[in-house]
Structures are given as C-alpha cells and as structure tokens.
C-alpha cells in the first residue's frame, strides 16, 4: 500500500494488468556530486530535491539517528553511479535502511529490538521458521586510505560479521572519527536478534517491512523475534 507510478499497463479480456513502482525509482537518477562534504540531513535534502522525493524526517529526527550529527565526506575514488547508490551508503552510515513510506516520502528506519505485535497460530495459514537466529557481534569495513580491512567486534564475538565493504562516506576524517562512526554502527546492529521466517497470514495493513513480530502456537518459539523483510499482498485472497 502506498503511492505508486504505473510503468506498464496490459489490457486483458476482463482485467487490466498494471506494473507500478514507488518513488524509490526516482533515485536511480545519475549521481551528481554537487556537495563533497556535509551532514547527513544536508545530503538527504539535496538528494530528495534532486530526485523530486519528499523527505519524511525533520532535521532533528535525522540528527537523533546514530552518526546523525557527524560531518561526512565523499571519497573521490568511489563506485557511486546513482543517487540510489549514495542513499545506500548514507543509510548504512546512519545505521538504518531506507524505503518509501505510504505517503510516498523517503523514510529511514532503524532495526528494532522489540516487537510491534504477536501473530498466533489462528491468524496464520502457513509458517516456517529457521532453526538459527540471525545476530551480529562484529563488522568489517575497508579503509581505502590504508587499503586495510578493519574489524570491530563486541565481547564476546560469537555471532555473524556484517561486511560493510568500502563505504565512500566513511573514508575522510581522523582515525578516531572513523572508529567512533563504525562503533556506533556495530552497537546499532547488535540489537538484531531475528529468526528468519516465511508465513502466510491474515492480512494486516498496518504492518510494513522492518516491523518486528513474535509468533505463538504451533511450531513457533514465542521467545524469539522475527523481522519482516518483504510483504506480498493478494487482493481478495489470503
């Protein structure tokens, strides 16, 4: 649900088949480095103005995110081709993921540590749950200036490592600044403690990607949480 733009329409005998996309497609516009350094809100404002997408946040809300008040610079030797690439790196630096909300605005969301609702076995038709829990206790990030892979870990380091690869927004500044930013990212993703799942449920229009759920009944472990990564909605069906 939300605001979508029709890209293709195919007429059939009794129906009209539509293929539509949300405003995230606008960020596939070629990247133009109009500003080489700035604060996250500055970059988001330029990006949204250039790509004609409204930002869902105030400056105060962006600054409240981890690393939201850090001065970032764009490393000249980068692989950024579109504004969508740039958004990927910026959201990563802000310990968030980006999506277009139901109002058609760009929204950044952090990983949550508490569920928004519980789905019991009478509200789902099918479900399968992984036998392992996805959680992170370390990150790996490449420093282009030194051409070294830097490893940051919690104690104990007994889970997965998230590979941030080369983020062109995290290359400038003092070593202490880079270390602080990466430590903030590590602390933010350490709240991830989700069981991968797949479930066919009674439709709940309030749910969105990124929402965290708990399941009860059947084979579900009610002590574990699961995060929605994608939603498929069938109109007039399950």
Language model feature labels by segment:
Residues 10-131, 175-176:
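Charged- and aromatic-enriched interaction segments used to assemble
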């Amino acid at each position: 649900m939300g605001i979508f733009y029709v890209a293709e329409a195919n007429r059939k005998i009794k129906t009209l088949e539509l293929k539509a996309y949300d405003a995230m497609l606008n960020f596939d516009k070629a990247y133009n480095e109009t500003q080489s350094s700035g604060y996250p809100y500055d970059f988001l404002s330029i990006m949204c103005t250039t790509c004609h997408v409204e930002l869902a946040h105030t400056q105060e809300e962006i600054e409240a995110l981890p690393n939201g008040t850090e001065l970032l610079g764009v490393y000249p030797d980068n692989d950024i081709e579109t504004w969508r690439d740039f958004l990927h790196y910026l959201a990563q630096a802000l310990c968030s993921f980006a999506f277009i909300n139901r109002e058609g605005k760009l929204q950044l969301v952090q990983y949550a540590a508490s569920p928004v609702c519980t789905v019991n076995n009478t509200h789902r038709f099918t479900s399968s749950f992984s036998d392992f829990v996805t959680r992170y206790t370390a990150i790996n990030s490449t420093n282009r200036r030194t051409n070294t892979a830097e490893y940051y870990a919690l104690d104990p380091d007994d889970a997965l490592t998230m590979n941030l690869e080369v983020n062109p927004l995290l290359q400038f500044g003092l070593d202490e600044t880079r270390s602080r930013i990466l430590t903030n990212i590590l602390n933010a993703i350490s709240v991830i403690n989700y069981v991968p799942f797949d479930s066919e449920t009674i439709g709940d229009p309030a749910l969105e990607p990124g929402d965290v759920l708990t399941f009860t009944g059947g084979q579900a472990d009610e002590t574990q949480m699961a995060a929605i990564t994608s939603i498929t909605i069938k109109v007039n069906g399950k």
